[in-house]
């Protein structure tokens, strides 16, 4: 079965990246419902302080499964909070069909660290 990788990129005003990263780190609790969405294989959030960007990278069973994130209200609410602070999103959020991969992609939907 082919996987789909969804990559969301959020650009933060330069002076706000540390605060934004902390908000994203703390948002893990309010976003735990993502783990219950059908088709999720793995999900992670990250920060690139040098480029003043946050990202969410997720792997799904299908494009339809990945597109659930476009309607997941807790994430939409979080995005509005970032937007109110001047953040901009790469739109439309791309969903990439995997052409090949090395290694295993998770499938339990459980958080990993």
Q: Residue ranges of each PLM-predicted region?
A:
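Short S/T/G/P-rich N-terminal loop/turn motif that feeds into the first structured element of a domain
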Residues: 1-54, 61-73, 81-113
């Amino acid at each position: 079965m082919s996987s789909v990788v969804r990559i969301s990129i959020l650009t933060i005003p330069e002076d706000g990246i540390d605060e934004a990263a902390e908000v994203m780190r703390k948002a893990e609790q309010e976003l735990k419902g993502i783990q219950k969405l059908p088709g999720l294989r793995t999900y992670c959030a990250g920060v690139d302080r040098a480029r003043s960007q946050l990202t969410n990278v997720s792997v799904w069973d299908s494009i339809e499964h990945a597109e659930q994130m476009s309607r997941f209200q807790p994430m939409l609410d979080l995005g509005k909070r970032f937007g109110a602070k001047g953040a901009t999103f790469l739109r439309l959020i791309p969903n990439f069909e995997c052409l090949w991969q090395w290694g295993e992609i998770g499938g339990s939907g459980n958080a990993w660290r």
